[in-house]
From Swiss-Prot:
UniProt record similarity statement: Belongs to the peptidase S54 family.
Protein name: Presenilin-associated rhomboid-like protein, mitochondrial
Protein role: Required for the control of apoptosis during postnatal growth. Essential for proteolytic processing of an antiapoptotic form of OPA1 which prevents the release of mitochondrial cytochrome c in response to intrinsic apoptotic signals. Required for the maturation of PINK1 into its 52kDa mature form after its cleavage by mitochondrial-processing peptidase (MPP). Promotes cleavage of serine/threonine-protein phosphatase PGAM5 in damaged mitochondria in response to loss of mitochondrial membrane potential.
Keywords, comma-separated and alphabetical: Hydrolase, Membrane, Mitochondrion, Mitochondrion inner membrane, Nucleus, Phosphoprotein, Protease, Serine protease, Transit peptide, Transmembrane, Transmembrane helix
InterPro entries documented for this protein: Peptidase_S54_rhomboid_dom, Rhomboid-like_sf, Rhomboid_protease_S54
Membrane topology, Mitochondrial intermembrane segments: 120-165, 229-242, 288-293, 353-377
Underlying gene: PARL
Membrane found in the keyword field: yes
Pfam families noted in UniProt: Rhomboid (PF01694)
Single biological process term from Gene Ontology: signal peptide processing
Subcellular compartments: Mitochondrion inner membrane
Residues passing through the membrane, by range: 100-119, 166-185, 206-228, 243-260, 271-287, 294-316, 331-352
Organism of provenance: Bos taurus
Length: 377
């Protein structure tokens, strides 16, 4: 009884050894406290603790992403696969420097490329007009093939509007990336480069690539349906070249707004989808045509004006960003909508109508470039 009390104290249970009230004699107590037996008990106790109860030290592993922590929040629309590793910077504001420069640089390059594209497109249209006259004459004397599959495809393509033909390439790119998500061996690469996260090691390229990335079929179908519905209106307002510059820039700008919100709130997590860029398209059309009538899919009997729809969407995304709703990236939606409103109101005058100096420089470069024969013009 006396030795059991000492062992309990040795185990660290906080129980001090006391003399037994009954059931023991002075000789038993003296024998229990003898040096040889006490040392043997200590030795045996040490061996038992080492071999029987002490756990081996765990190997230190690098910290992985924790989907249950408050610092890591994942939307329900992103893939449930583990990212390689998240290491949020101890200086989170510094992580926004590279994305900021990338956003400004990419936006400038997008609009510059669109201006040059429009210049080349106008030149090619003049040339194709004369080529078309020659082609029509050849088709008149060439026997026509009836029921040709290629002819049916060309007929379908020619019946599309300019806006629908423009967004067809965007939809095809989204479908291709969606298929890549189905390849198990590519999921780590897809998470790294096709989802945007300010806590990731790769910050800049996902700002653009995530705009074409969808993991959920419903997410992709809903976004592409909205884009297809507004394609004719937005291309009629901006033109094909300017629309592409606005769409790509909107994807990067909305992702940067998402980065800022995640860093400010500390709720890191990957995001993906074209919703930010599509919100720019929707906001631009609703701002330009506020009295247009819109309806919800599957509920065509309920209609409302485009201006009221835009106000409701902005209010919902603002509430979601403030209250921390996690199903959508409300900061990206809000950033895309505000960019669309700003561009239609001010950006078109400030950016697109001041593209002439760049076009003149490009024209001079094309005019002064060497001919194919090697001489200069």
């Amino acid at each position: 009884m006396a030795w059991r009390g000492w062992a309990q104290r040795g185990w660290g249970c906080g129980q001090a050894w006391t003399l037994p009230v009954c059931g023991g004699s002075y000789e038993e107590l003296t024998a229990a406290l003898a040096p040889s037996r006490l040392l043997r008990r200590r030795f045996n106790f040490f061996i038992q603790q080492k071999c029987g109860f002490r756990k081996a030290p765990r190997k230190v592993e690098p910290r992985r992403s924790d989907t249950s922590s408050e610092a890591y929040k994942r939307s329900a629309l992103i893939p449930p696969v583990e990212e390689t590793a998240f290491y949020p910077s101890p200086y989170p504001i510094r992580t926004l420097v590279k994305p900021l420069f990338f956003t400004v640089g990419f936006t400038g390059c997008a609009f510059g490329s669109a201006a040059i594209w429009q210049y080349e497109s106008l030149k090619s249209k003049v040339q194709s007009y004369f080529d078309g006259i020659k082609a029509d004459w050849l088709d008149s004397i060439r026997p026509q093939k009836e029921g040709d599959f290629r002819k049916e495809i060309n007929k379908w393509w020619n019946n599309l509007s300019d806006g629908q033909r423009t967004v067809t390439g965007i939809i095809a790119a989204n479908v291709f990336v969606f298929c890549l998500w189905r390849v198990p061996s590519l999921q780590r690469t897809m998470i790294r480069y096709f989802t945007s996260n300010p806590a990731s090691k790769v910050l800049c390229s996902p700002m653009l690539l995530s705009t074409f990335s969808h993991f959920s079929l419903f997410h992709m179908a809903a976004n592409m349906y909205v884009l297809w519905s507004f394609s004719s209106s937005i291309v009629n307002i901006l033109g094909q070249e300017q629309f592409m510059a606005v769409y790509l820039s909107a994807g990067v700008i909305s992702t940067f707004v998402s980065y800022v919100c995640k860093v400010a709130t500390g709720r890191y997590g990957p995001s993906l989808g074209a919703s930010g860029a599509i919100m720019t398209v929707l906001a631009a059309v609703c701002t330009k045509i506020p009295e247009g009538r819109l309806a919800i899919i599957f509920l065509p009997m309920f209609t409302f004006t485009a201006g009221n729809a835009l106000k409701a969407i902005i209010a919902m995304d603002t509430a979601g960003m403030i209250l921390g709703w996690k199903f959508f990236d409300h900061a990206a939606h809000l950033g895309g909508a505000l960019f669309g409103i700003w561009y239609i109101t001010y950006g078109h005058e400030l950016i697109w109508k001041n593209r002439e100096p760049l076009v003149k420089i490009w024209h001079e470069m094309r005019t002064n470039s060497p001919k194919k024969g090697g001489g200069s013009k």
